[in-house]
């Protein structure tokens, strides 16, 4: 057993070295892309955009013309930049300020001088929060008149300051419970954002900073309320506002007719222009490429960025542990109900309910279930996101665990139940003391596979704004624009967790088989 564990550790070590080597090597361009010099050259080009942004909408209009223009949509701007650097797309359309931030880290990228389009940013609020919208508008007008917003923007763009506004302390703000209730607030004004959009919102030293964060804090000071910033996927911001998970969204959001049908918007607080980014392929401009050690230092050691992975690892372990407990308990109950009905009849209604549950949970994607539970089931409840993830993954895994355990129960000879009952044991005691131990021993390897699947499925927790291992790597990638290194390390961490879980299952299986000797 010790030798086998040693082999697992060696395998993990060499896998991590391989991933780090691949990250250091990078990747060469697979093909020559179209050369763009002006906006007119976009015809027939492959355009990269961040999903759900203004750039997405504008580029989609070009795609609809049917002249060969194609739009590639990415969840994060950093992913689009990586695709541009690898010549997977011809260009990227984004806002000017983030484009300058991208270029600062990747000198081989160029920003075309011609403006692609002009737009302005606003804060989104639920349509039924008219008082809150009016209050935010009043705050924006005051901040504009006093020059506060212009000062925030200039200090960020011209001087590169991460925090350009210091909010007042909570004891200075005098808004009472009645005023909070009138605005539709509980304790604070919660803003949803997507912290991958430097300089408007991004991570620095473990905190979300940027223009939008400073503007939100300034608005809170004028309104006299505390402000809370929550990070989530960009395409989940409007949904979170609609569901009441947050009161407002501020993430470089542009007002469009389609969005106005579903959500309300405040007055604009910043004017921006859309630009086109291209990869010049200038090796001299890019300079000497950093080696593996430099990349590792940039991704994990600078500003203590490894903390994002540690936080994600902790959340992943907590979610997995409690989801396993929930799935095994619920799956066992369902398996007993189904096995009882198949062997002895009766329990028709409970069996029908169990079958309905299994059909729904196995017939719909895990991510859809997670989003429904968070945005619909717990829409009006202010619950911990880890709790929501445990419930979602536990319920999903229970559907598969139930069928595995049921097959184990059915594999036990029916005479075992009759023997237990003849000894004076009740049905429940016979099932618990005689049938289930044999069933678990028979299906333990299959159960182990399902639990490993559960562990890997927790990687979608970031869609509800929860920092898991994958989300931690996303944060690092959004800061460093380095793709392979964070993803390679996260892949190795998942591999180590899976090997550990697999070793635990094998050890338990070996212990249970001692009874056969």
Locate the predicted segments by residue.
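Immediate post-signal peptide segment of exported/extracytoplasmic ligand-binding proteins
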Residues: 31-46, 167-207, 242, 285
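Extracytoplasmic small-molecule ligand-binding "clamshell" domains
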Residues: 39, 70-74, 82, 151, ...
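Periplasmic-binding protein-like
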Residues: 96, 100-140, 161-172, 195, ...
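Acidic, polar ligand-binding/catalytic clefts
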Residues: 29-41, 106-117, 127, 217, ...
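C-terminal motif of bacterial Sec signal peptides marking the signal peptidase cleavage site
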Residues: 21-24
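Ligand-binding clefts/hinges and TM-proximal coupling segments of bilobed small-molecule sensing domains
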Residues: 54-71, 111, 141-181, 291, ...
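Transmembrane alpha-helices and adjacent helix-loop boundaries
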Residues: 288-517
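Ligand-binding cleft/hinge of the Venus flytrap
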Residues: 55-73, 104, 154, 201-204, ...
């Amino acid at each position: 057993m010790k030798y086998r564990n040693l082999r697992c550790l060696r395998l993990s070590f060499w896998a991590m070295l391989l991933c780090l080597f691949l990250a250091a090597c990078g990747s060469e361009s697979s093909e020559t892309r179209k050369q763009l010099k002006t906006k007119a050259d976009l015809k027939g080009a492959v355009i990269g955009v961040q999903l759900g942004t203004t750039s997405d909408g504008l580029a989609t209009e070009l795609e609809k013309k049917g002249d060969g223009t194609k739009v590639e949509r990415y969840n994060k701007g950093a992913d689009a930049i990586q695709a541009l650097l690898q010549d997977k797309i011809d260009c990227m359309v984004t806002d000017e300020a983030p484009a300058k931030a991208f270029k600062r880290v990747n000198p081989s990228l160029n920003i075309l001088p011609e403006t692609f389009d002009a737009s302005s940013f606003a804060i989104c609020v639920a349509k039924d929060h008219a008082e809150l919208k009016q209050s935010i508008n009043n705050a924006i007008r005051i901040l504009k008149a006093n020059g506060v917003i212009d000062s925030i923007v200039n200090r960020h763009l011209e001087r590169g300051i991460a925090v350009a506004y210091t909010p007042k302390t909570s004891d200075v703000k005098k808004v009472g419970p009645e005023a909070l209730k009138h605005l539709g607030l509980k304790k604070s004004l919660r803003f949803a954002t997507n912290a991958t959009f430097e300089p408007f919102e991004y991570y620095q030293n473990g905190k979300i900073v940027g223009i939008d964060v400073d503007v939100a804090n300034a608005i809170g000071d004028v309104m006299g309320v505390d402000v809370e910033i929550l990070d989530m996927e960009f395409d989940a911001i409007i949904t979170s506002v609609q569901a009441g998970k947050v009161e407002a969204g501020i993430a470089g959001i542009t007002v469009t007719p389609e969005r106005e049908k579903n959500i309300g918007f405040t007055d604009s607080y910043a004017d921006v222009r859309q630009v086109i980014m291209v990869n010049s392929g200038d090796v001299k401009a890019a300079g000497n490429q950093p080696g593996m050690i430099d990349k590792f230092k940039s991704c994990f050691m600078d500003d203590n960025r490894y903390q994002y992975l540690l936080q994600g690892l902790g959340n992943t372990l907590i979610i997995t542990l409690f989801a396993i407990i929930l799935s095994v308990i619920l799956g066992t109950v369902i398996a007993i109900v189904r096995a009882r009905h198949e062997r002895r009849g009766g329990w028709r209604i409970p069996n029908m309910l169990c079958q309905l549950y299994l059909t729904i949970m196995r017939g719909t994607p895990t991510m859809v279930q997670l989003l429904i539970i968070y945005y619909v089931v717990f829409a009006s409840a202010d619950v911990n996101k880890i709790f929501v993830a445990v419930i979602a993954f536990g319920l999903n895994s229970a559907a598969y665990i139930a069928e595995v355990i049921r097959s184990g129960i059915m594999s036990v000879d029916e005479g075992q139940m009759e023997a237990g009952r003849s000894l004076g044991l009740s049905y429940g005691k016979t099932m618990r003391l005689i049938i289930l131990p044999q069933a678990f021993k028979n299906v333990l390897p299959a159960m182990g596979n399902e639990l490993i699947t559960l562990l890997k499925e927790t990687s979608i927790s970031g869609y509800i704004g929860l920092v898991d291992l994958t989300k931690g790597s996303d944060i690092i990638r959004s800061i460093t624009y380095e793709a392979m290194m964070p993803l390679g390390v996260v892949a190795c961490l998942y591999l180590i967790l899976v090997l550990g879980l697999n070793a635990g299952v094998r050890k338990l299986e070996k212990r249970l088989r001692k009874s056969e000797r």
